[in-house]
Design a protein with these regions (language model features):
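Structure-specific nucleic-acid interaction/processing domains
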Residues: 1-146
Length: 146
C-alpha cells in the first residue's frame, strides 16, 4: 500500500489524470533508514506488426512497422531497486512503509524531481540514514570524501 497526502493509494484511478509517475520514499521503522526513488505508472513496449496487420493498413505514405502497447507497471508491488533494501524487505516487510513524495506528468519531470529530492536530503552524504548509494548511476557514495 502507498500513502499520498495522508490517503491510501491502492488503485491507478486514484492518481490525477495525466500522471506519468511519482517520486517515493520507503522508510524502515526499525532502523530509521529510508530510500528515495521514482516509479512510472505505465510501461510502453513496441510490438512488431504481422504481415496481415501491415496489409490492413491503407493509405499513402510510410506505414508503421510496430504497434505501441501500453500496460500498467508493477507500481503496486514495487519497493525499490537497492539490493540491501530488497534483502531487508525479504525478512521484515511489516516494518517498512511506502509514501509518495510528489507526482510527475512526464519522464523528464519525474527524473528532475527524483534528483531534486535526492540532493535535498543529501542521500549520498548520509549512508547511515539512506539506502541510496548513487544518483542517476553517475554520483556514488564511494566517490565522496569520507
Amino acid at each position: 500500500m502507498w500513502k499520498f497526502n495522508g490517503e491510501e493509494i491502492t488503485d491507478i484511478d486514484q492518481f490525477p489524470t495525466g500522471t506519468f509517475g511519482f517520486v517515493y520514499r520507503v522508510f524502515n521503522k526499525n532502523t530509521g533508514k529510508a530510500y528515495i526513488g521514482k516509479k512510472v505508472l505505465y510501461h510502453s513496449t513496441k510490438k512488431k506488426l504481422t504481415q496481415k496487420e501491415l496489409a490492413e493498413i491503407e493509405g499513402q505514405g510510410r506505414r508503421p512497422s510496430y504497434r505501441l502497447i501500453v500496460k500498467e507497471s508493477d507500481w503496486k508491488s514495487y519497493w525499490g531497486s537497492n539490493k540491501l533494501l530488497l534483502e531487508e524487505l525479504k525478512t521484515d516487510k511489516d516494518n517498512f512503509e511506502r509514501s509518495i513524495i510528489c507526482l510527475a506528468k512526464d519522464k523528464k519531470q519525474l527524473t528532475y524531481f527524483e534528483c531534486k529530492y535526492l540532493f535535498i536530503y543529501s542521500v549520498l552524504e548520509k549512508p547511515e540514514e539512506f539506502y541510496n548509494d548513487n544518483i542517476l548511476g553517475k554520483f556514488f557514495t564511494k566517490d565522496l570524501p569520507s
